Design a protein with these regions (language model features):
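AAA+ P-loop ATPase mechanoenzymes
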Residues: 1-70
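Short loop/turn elements that form and flank the Walker-type P-loop nucleotide-binding site
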Residues: 86-88, 115-116, 140-142, 173-176
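AAA+/P-loop NTPase substrate/partner-engagement loops
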Residues: 111-144, 150-156
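Conserved catalytic/switch belt of AAA+ P-loop NTPases
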Residues: 135-139, 154-177
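Pre-Walker A (pre-P-loop) alpha-helix and adjacent loop at the N terminus of AAA/AAA+ ATPase modules
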Residues: 57-91
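A conserved segment at the C-terminal end of the G1
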Residues: 106-110
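Walker A/P-loop nucleotide-binding motif
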Residues: 85-105
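Well-ordered alpha-helical segments embedded in enzymatic catalytic cores
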Residues: 74-78, 129-133, 162
Length: 177
């Protein structure tokens, strides 16, 4: 290298050549984990039109999940089918407060074999911007659950029609992920 590159080269990291990654290993890593924020984080908040990573998500373990096994197993089976590339239905969990609806969804991030799953929490105020989020996520190999907690609508609520259009389908095709 030319001498003028000396100061620059001196500050570059020194990589050990003893265990290089093969192209196949790198490909498999990015296929399984995504890239950028999706490689480093599994839970996100959709806030003001941006994905914000959740550094320490509150994901209860299996030992904390008591009762409602039938319902939880259906959610797990539906999510597993999505991760396997099958078409799946949207899921609506309803019930009394404290019955584990939110915990059931958050627990999915702790399950073995669900490493390609990412969870994105969307507040009711962000529903109108949901098509933009869906376009952002479309085409990626990872699978996403859009999690809307404590959803309630007033009679004249405009966010209801935005969600209804997304759930029932509009002109844009729903991405497979």
């Amino acid at each position: 290298a030319p001498r003028e590159y000396g100061p620059v080269l001196a500050n570059l990291p020194r990589w050990r050549g003893s265990s290089p990654f093969s192209f196949a290993e790198l490909t498999e890593f990015y296929r399984a984990n995504g890239a950028g924020l999706f490689a480093r984080h599994r839970a996100f908040l959709w806030e003001d039109g941006a994905l914000c990573p959740v550094e320490q998500p509150d994901c209860p373990g299996a030992d904390e999940m008591l009762g409602y096994e039938l319902q939880r197993n259906r959610v797990i089976a539906n999510t597993r089918a999505m991760l396997e590339g099958n078409l799946v239905n949207n899921v609506l969990l309803y019930g009394d407060s404290g019955t584990g609806k939110s915990a059931t969804v958050k627990n999915l991030l702790t399950l073995p074999g669900f490493e390609a799953l990412r969870l994105i929490e969307v507040q009711k105020e962000g529903l109108a911007d949901l098509p933009r989020l869906i376009r952002t996520l479309g085409g990626r190999r990872l699978k996403f659950i859009l999690f809307i907690d404590d959803l309630a609508f007033d009679q004249d609520d405009k966010t209801y029609s935005a969600l209804k259009t997304i759930l029932e389908g509009g002109l844009e095709r729903r991405p497979a992920n």
